[in-house]
């Protein structure tokens, strides 16, 4: 029988300045904290926060996900962040507000939503 592999405790990195990436789609919100080079420090999603189905896309679910990711980033010493927002979802503002309320100093906010220059054909309109 093979011996169980010994894994050391997760080391704490001290990263005072980072970037918060908020990807808000129509179905989910993903919040990722990285260092300035783009290496991931912490992340959370509204689906991973316990919300399923259509509740994942609510602003409250985005707020909970942002709080979870922010808590993990603060454990690694992060204090100042720039915010990059991508996507059309409803959780954009709520996630930004949650990051600010978690005690981070926000240095900049940029919208990096990709805009097609007449690229792919969009999905057909829903008839409900």
UniProtKB/Swiss-Prot annotation:
GO terms for cellular component: ribonucleoprotein complex; ribosome
One GO-annotated biological process of the protein: translation
Domain of life from the UniProt record: Bacteria
Gene3D superfamilies: Ribosomal protein S11 (3.30.420.80)
Keywords (A to Z) from UniProt: Ribonucleoprotein, Ribosomal protein, RNA-binding, rRNA-binding
Pfam families attached to this UniProt entry: Ribosomal_S11
Gene Ontology terms for molecular function: rRNA binding; structural constituent of ribosome
Subunit record text: Part of the 30S ribosomal subunit. Interacts with proteins S7 and S18. Binds to IF-3.
UniProt function note: Located on the platform of the 30S subunit, it bridges several disparate RNA helices of the 16S rRNA. Forms part of the Shine-Dalgarno cleft in the 70S ribosome.
Family statement: Belongs to the universal ribosomal protein uS11 family.
NCBIfam families attached to this UniProt entry: PRK05309.1, uS11_bact
Matches recorded under HAMAP family: Ribosomal_uS11
Protein name per UniProt: Small ribosomal subunit protein uS11
Organism: Solidesulfovibrio magneticus (strain ATCC 700980 / DSM 13731 / RS-1) (Desulfovibrio magneticus)
Gene behind this protein: rpsK
